[in-house]
Amino acid sequence: MRRVLTSAAVAAALALAVTACGDGSGDAGSSPAKSAAPAEVSGTVTWWDTSDATTEGPVFQEIIKDFEAKYPKIKVNYVNVPFADARDKFKTAAQSGSGAPDVLRTDVGWVAEFASLGYLAPLDGTPAVDKPEEFLPVPAASGKYNGKTYGVPQVTDTLGLLYNKELLKKAGYDEPPATMADLKKVALDVKSKTGAGGLALNVDAYFLLPFIYGEGGDFVDVQNKKITISSPQSVAGVKIVEDLITSGAAVKPALQDSYTNAETAFKDGKVAMIFNGPWSNADNLGGKVFKDNPDNFGVAPVPAGSAKAGSPLGGHDYTVYAGSKNLDASYLFVQFMDSAESQAKIAGKLGLLPTRQPAYSASEATANPKIAQWAKPMETAVERPWIPEAASLFQPLVEGYQKLAGGQTTTEPMLKDVATAYQGILKGWSL
């Protein structure tokens, strides 16, 4: 999965009138119909998978084959939709009442928004919510809205510092940097002593959050309905990024498709460190400098700022479209795809982190050493605000970050502009 949160999103979208699938109350189909006996369920389930089509999609399709073998009366229409396009594409289809999938692999930050618009079917009391006691609490919370379950957690993730052990060793370091100050020093030493770049940045809002969290900042203060993106703490965090760029500790960022550029440079050994998540494990291990030497691939928690080490909690949920004509089949599909057995298989083959506790101890998961490597980074994961407007907060910030990385602005005015944009999204919130 490539986490690139740059699809256009404006506040007006939140006020769109909901058509056939609901009235915008987030209470579509408030009492789900009693599910049919599994053996009698038939139909076709269209699933929009937003994972990486090359590295992840084939594994999910293997599990689909197992599902169809268990439920021969149900067929799955698998559609891979690029992550960057999926949010807007689903909203357009759901609003029109035509073309929406039965099941969507939904970013955790989209669930509250889609539920508030009436686009999602409530899942409580259906087979989709199976053995909820097994779920890790924070990933499970991402699927809740107004006290109801609209999504069940498929995978969880966060950001870590990924590093090339050999390049760090050549620069004189046996361990990765533990603080943001050390990050700059190590990156500059790698640059001067090895000829490789020290750090590559992904110019995307999600990837700014470890720097902001590290100084005690955040997008918003939900409890007090306050916009905090331009607070002194958030400013201090983004100033660290600005300094990494201007000092040369970070290579000059690509402003277009920066994710791919940073990832490719890391896999090819042209830079020593990047921030990325467990979804990139398979991609990285296929790279030139790691393919024949997987032990060279290091994973560590994001370096700590003056307040803490913190990176955003991410992941994906399975959600069911409220207007689906195949609800019973969709519930069974979600149940199967999200079982501990399926999660363990996904963890073993892709290194993606399960959301069910039993999956972590399953032999298929423990066979992949990357699962254990992500335990420490996950300890620093920060829960994001599960509010309907959450996904819309990324676009103004990424636009500002691009200007900052391109040298068109500096931290303080950039974040003031972002805060002003947030006032148009978060009606009634204070600065």
Residue ranges and their predicted role:
Residues D124-P137, G198, G217-A236, G286-D292, ...:
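Short, solvent-exposed loop/beta-turn-alpha elements that line the ligand-binding surface or hinge
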Residues P101-D102, D130-L168, G197-L201, P303, ...:
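A structural signal for short loop-to-beta-strand junctions that line the ligand-binding cleft
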Residues A187-L188, K226-A254:
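Glycine-centered hinge/linker elements that transmit conformational signals in sensory
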Residues V138-A141, F297-P301, A347-E399, K403, ...:
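Long, aromatic- and glycine/proline-rich binding clefts that accommodate carbohydrate-like moieties
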Residues A69, A171, K239, D243-A250, ...:
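Extracytoplasmic/periplasmic substrate-recognition and gating elements
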Residues D107-T158, D182-K184, S192, F211-G214, ...:
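Hinge/lid segment of periplasmic solute-binding proteins
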Residues V111-Y119, P139-E175, V203-Q223, P312-T319, ...:
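Periplasmic solute-binding protein
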Residues R2-V18, G22-A112, V129, K288, ...:
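Conserved N-terminal structural module of periplasmic/extracytoplasmic solute-binding proteins
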